[in-house]
UniProtKB/Swiss-Prot annotation:
GO cellular component terms attached to this protein's record: cytoplasm
Catalysed reaction, written as an equation: L-threonylcarbamoyladenylate + adenosine(37) in tRNA = N(6)-L-threonylcarbamoyladenosine(37) in tRNA + AMP + H(+)
Gene that this sequence comes from: tsaD
Residues binding Fe cation: 111, 115, 304
Main location: cytoplasm
A Gene Ontology molecular function term of the record: iron ion binding
Residue numbers binding substrate: 134-138, 167, 180, 276
Full protein name: tRNA N6-adenosine threonylcarbamoyltransferase
UniProt record similarity statement: Belongs to the KAE1 / TsaD family.
Enzyme class: transferase
InterPro entries: ATPase_NBD (IPR043129), Gcp-like_dom (IPR000905), KAE1/TsaD (IPR017861), TsaD (IPR022450)
Stretches assigned to coiled coil: none
Amino acid sequence: MLVLGIETSCDETGIALYDGERGLLAHTLYSQIKLHADYGGVVPELASRDHVRKVIPLIEEVLNQAGVGKSDIDAIAYTAGPGLVGALMVGGAIASALAYALGIPTIGVHHMEGHLLAPMLEENPPEFPFVALLVSGGHTQLVRVDGVGEYELLGESVDDAAGEAFDKVAKMLGLDYPGGPQVAKLAEEGNLQRFKFPRPMTDRPGLDFSFSGLKTFTLNTLQEAEASGGVDDNLRADVAACFQEAVVETMVIKCRRALRQTGLKRLIMAGGVSANRRLREKLQQMVKGEKALVYYARPEFCTDNGAMIAYAGHQRLAVGQRGDLSVLATPRWPLVELPSIKG
């Protein structure tokens, strides 16, 4: 079965073709970073309009890459949520219209299930069951995964997600959008020991996260420095390093707890923040001590992409799950509500 995947949940237009026997045949991605940079964040209306301009040309591009035609497509998977409602509707409308014209089925894919399954596209994918750390956009979650659609939420952020905290701290430091990679880059020049940032909610039982306090601590640190002599480049780098280390160590501590609590020995990390090099290093150290394994998607599949949507959609289409041709756009959609592919 050849599945066309369409990702338009936020500020990236991702298109891919996945075949059940041959694997990933082609994928392409257009990022709107430059479009939104002047605004310091994603402008939903601009995002939607840009998806309208890009989806069809990118579909043609992946078809050419794979050497197939529209008539070869067996089904279309598109991101149905969570995400920006206008952006979701663009992808859903194009998917439904094309499917109607071709006489093929569609399926709406959960964006976070796409991220969760992205490591399955690698050469040595993890086996079920495993613990998943999902760190993408407005989500920071720990999930027990026993199969596709078999998800148990172990913990999540009670306020800001890790990615949101990175973006907000980036603004405090005067860094460009998107903030996460910019903070990580600046942190490489900083002194991890200069400031003692808290590790939120690690002093109590449980697997939930909280990052709003770290955001406030960062702001207070910068304000105190400004009042006592000013903020120079060295101090900004030190703040970035200490903030990042606090976020990373907090997530590592929670992942260790999740592995011990579930008794599982496989951990996957997915979502945009999973590309963070420091987080990967610290998780690798942690799982070694736990005699466990950690898996990631390749960097290009950590951020939003069409390949993960095509793959996730294929898993459900292959067992007979289908959508109708109405456009499904669900800005808020709990992952644990998804049905198992076992029926």
